[in-house]
Amino acid sequence: MWGCWLGLLLLLLAGQAALEARRSRWRRELAPGLHLRGIRDAGGRYCQEQDMCCRGRADECALPYLGATCYCDLFCNRTVSDCCPDFWDFCLGIPPPFPPVQGCMHGGRIYPVFGTYWDNCNRCTCHEGGHWECDQEPCLVDPDMIKAINRGNYGWQAGNHSAFWGMTLDEGIRYRLGTIRPSSTVMNMNEIYTVLGQGEVLPTAFEASEKWPNLIHEPLDQGNCAGSWAFSTAAVASDRVSIHSLGHMTPILSPQNLLSCDTHHQQGCRGGRLDGAWWFLRRRGVVSDNCYPFSGREQNEASPTPRCMMHSRAMGRGKRQATSRCPNGQVDSNDIYQVTPAYRLGSDEKEIMKELMENGPVQALMEVHEDFFLYQRGIYSHTPVSQGRPEQYRRHGTHSVKITGWGEETLPDGRTIKYWTAANSWGPWWGERGHFRIVRGTNECDIETFVLGVWGRVGMEDMGHH
């Protein structure tokens, strides 16, 4: 009984296999020719690359060809041809019977010879014979890297940020960072050590915006201006002035004022130093972002930094008064805001935490790697997904950000990860509404190496005036 059923089952499977084979043969016989409009990729090495020439009909003697299938068997050389472009020359030693396409096919349209299209950050150019040649630059948005990060157990998720699409990794490093690493003299400046009181315990989580509501400002967007030195400095100073004035002054300070006017050893949208930025804020001061708005997100090393449009004079006791009207003609208030000298904190996480909790957000230098641009959410740490790739895929540069808090999170695998919360200067569309979390206590990306604090210059007359 079971033998009969087994025989019937095998017979049925054999019949289905034969039917599928016939359908495959019919599909090939009924398919339109590949070269009705001429041979695309006429210089392509298909049969030759595989050293493949088959007699008669051999459906397995096939290769992928521009989204279709081409063959290297004699059967392909019939009225309706589905031969690979080099079949006639390589297998038969004769010229092909079809002319090469004068142009290249992409996305359903034909491009003329020397026509171009962009594939992410790489330009592809059509050459004679119908084949494309594309640049091989590493792109800032790397879909393969996104997949590798999200498959791994790294504690954070990567994503495609449309504002970065079409940029090379080199352009991201050149235009989206912009803090020049301090000189050895500055890096060796004395640290101010913060001592925890006996029995003092810091909370497991803290966020500046919760302690000082309405006094912590949201991230701005530096665009393709390599000016993180100005944006992070203005961001920390804005919060510190707001906190130290007890909310009597709550300016969003102008990065453009620094970019255009702080020109001593600074390079505007081509990069700058933090010590120079804090010197300018202490000695000259800046106005609000409303008064002197950012000129545009497309400033870069190829465009000159706009000239300085704010000037001031000394009033005595180190204070400054503006002598220029606001570049934004719709704003009347041209008040100058200043700070005291910046000071460096120790690299111990508890010292940074205590300073942040008592006096407000701090500024941190960090090394940005190729995967950081793709950050979407979670607790960031630099991943090894680019190891083993050529050097041009493994780039890094110096950046500066504003640290606003800290916390801990238990991951699905049971690990507890400590983190900093920081504000970037790439706009609210990036990361966690413009912010990111990064592993705390291990000096991840050197973020605990060079941390600065500052006091807003606030007097009683300022409190009354504002």
UniProtKB/Swiss-Prot annotation:
List the molecular function annotations (GO) for this entry.
cysteine-type peptidase activity; laminin binding
Question: How would you summarize where this protein is expressed among tissues?
Answer: Highly expressed in kidney, heart and adrenocortical cells of adrenal glands. Moderately expressed in spleen and liver. Also found in prostate, seminal vesicle, epididymis and testis in male reproductive organs. In adrenal glands is found in the outer cortical regions corresponding to the zona glomerulosa (zG) and the undifferentiated cell zone (zU) (at protein level).
Cysteine pairs bridged by disulfides in the record: C53-C72, C70-C72, C70-C84, C76-C83, C84-C91
Q: Which residues form the signal peptide?
A: 1-21
Compartments, record wording = Secreted
The stated induction of this gene product is: Down-regulated in prostate after castration.
Pinpoint the SMB domain residues: 49-96
> One Pfam family, short name please?
Peptidase_C1
Listed A to Z, the keywords are: Disulfide bond, Glycoprotein, Secreted, Signal
Entries under SMART domains matching the protein: Pept_C1
Has UniProt tagged this entry with the keyword Flavoprotein? no
Residues carrying a glycan:
N77, N160
Q: GO biological process: any one? A: proteolysis
Q: Which GO cellular component terms, listed alphabetically, does the Swiss-Prot or TrEMBL entry include?
A: collagen-containing extracellular matrix; cytoplasm; extracellular space
Chief place of localization: secreted
Maturation and modification? Glycosylated.
The function of this protein is:
May be implicated in the adrenocortical zonation and in mechanisms for repressing the CYP11B1 gene expression in adrenocortical cells. This is a non catalytic peptidase C1 family protein.
Family, similarity comment: Belongs to the peptidase C1 family.
The protein's name in its UniProt record: Tubulointerstitial nephritis antigen-like
Q: Which organism is it from?
A: Mus musculus
What is this organism's lineage? Eukaryota, Metazoa, Chordata, Craniata, Vertebrata
Which gene name does the record give?
Tinagl1
